[in-house]
């Protein structure tokens, strides 16, 4: 792990060699038990503007299952330190951990809300092969995450966060809405505390990844660096690219990804021209008539998956139910 001084050195190098735009978001991700008050102050002085803490849960037993080393009591302390340093704050939560009850999840949500951070992320647990938890699930030592349980927990998160003044701008991300945000009509374009880093992915912007294992995406090209830090450093010393492999995306894949990512946001995506809406367009009926006369879009509205009023304005914006079934909505919009 890089310490504060090393992170500051990297940021200084980027500023001198490439340049950092005025007002740019510069986020530091940290485990609650690896940061200090002094380190957060130094990070802010170096140019970091935001810190995201991996809280995950407020329940000790769940943290143990997730192999997290911090205690629940540590999180409000480091959040307060970050605020005092002048950093925007965020916490990441995970739901669906084996053994987690709905009451456990509610306790974690209420704890996170009590810290009054600017931003909260709530991710469903992904059990990956090759991990300790993946092996435990495969052996039957831990139960497989239950989709219905995860849906109930997401609905609870949406309700509690909404009541507390947090607005969703991407399925897993909620931001504390300021007065200016509310006046703007809840467009994530204007959310002061929405993560620019997250939005870059959901809006299909280009990005460059630096460091071992980092991924980059520019236009139709996508590539990733070698994962081993020693191999990464050796390539740089030898004047070689650290890129290990890559791919060129065809137009169909790019369109699928644009829809799949864009539909996850509270801005939604334009319906016109999508494969699932072209039948009405080609018939000369226009999208509005297509919505009213049946077809995929009308079915999505009838099933309560996309907002009907937004669809009549030409945009697909997910309802709460639609957020739970976003992959299905994507397939329908793509005409699969």
Q: At which residue positions do the language-model features occur?
A:
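C-terminal scaffold of the Radical SAM
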Residues: 1-289
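A short, conserved structural fragment
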Residues: 301-313
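Mobile late-domain/C-terminal helix-loop "cap" segments
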Residues: 282, 290-294, 310
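Short, amphipathic alpha-helical interaction segments positioned at domain boundaries
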Residues: 320-336
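Short, Lys/Arg-rich nucleic-acid/phosphate-binding segment
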Residues: 172-174, 310-315
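Auxiliary N-terminal substrate/complex-recognition segments of SAM-dependent methyltransferases
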Residues: 2, 294-297, 327
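Short, hydrophobic-biased segments on the C-terminal half of alpha helices
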Residues: 11, 297-298
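Charged substrate- and nucleic-acid-binding regions of tRNA-handling and nucleotidyl-transfer enzymes
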Residues: 271, 298-300
């Amino acid at each position: 792990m890089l310490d504060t001084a090393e992170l500051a050195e990297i940021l200084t190098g980027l500023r001198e060699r490439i340049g950092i735009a005025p007002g740019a978001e510069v986020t530091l991700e940290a485990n609650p038990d690896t940061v200090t008050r002094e380190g957060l102050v130094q990070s802010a002085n170096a140019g970091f503007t935001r810190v995201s803490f991996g809280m995950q849960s407020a329940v000790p037993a769940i943290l143990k299952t997730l192999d997290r080393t911090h205690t629940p009591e540590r999180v409000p302390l480091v959040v307060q330190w970050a605020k005092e340093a002048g950093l925007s704050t965020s916490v990441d939560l995970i739901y669906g951990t084996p053994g987690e009850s709905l009451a456990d999840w509610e306790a974690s949500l209420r704890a996170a809300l009590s810290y009054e951070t600017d931003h909260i992320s709530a991710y469903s647990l992904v059990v990956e092969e090759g991990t300790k938890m993946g092996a435990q699930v495969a052996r039957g030592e831990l139960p497989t995450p239950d989709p219905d349980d995860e849906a109930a927990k997401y609905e609870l998160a949406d309700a509690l966060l909404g009541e507390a003044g947090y607005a969703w701008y991407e399925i897993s991300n909620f931001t504390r809405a300021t007065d200016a945000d509310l006046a703007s009509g809840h467009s994530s374009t204007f959310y002061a505390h929405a993560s620019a880093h997250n939005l870059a992915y959901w809006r299909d912007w280009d990005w460059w990844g630096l460091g071992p294992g980092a991924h980059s995406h520019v236009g139709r090209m996508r590539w990733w660096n070698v994962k081993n830090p020693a191999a990464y450093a050796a390539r740089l010393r030898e004047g070689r690219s650290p890129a290990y492999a890559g791919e060129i995306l065809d137009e169909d894949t790019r369109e699928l990804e644009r829809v799949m990512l864009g539909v996850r946001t509270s801005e939604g995506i334009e319906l016109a021209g999508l494969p699932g809406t072209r039948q009405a367009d080609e018939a000369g009926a226009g999208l509005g008539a297509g919505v009213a006369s049946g077809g995929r879009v009308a079915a999505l509205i009838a099933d309560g998956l996309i907002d009907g009023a937004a669809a009549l304005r030409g945009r697909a914006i997910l309802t709460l139910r639609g957020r739970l079934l976003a992959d299905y909505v994507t397939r329908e919009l793509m005409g699969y």
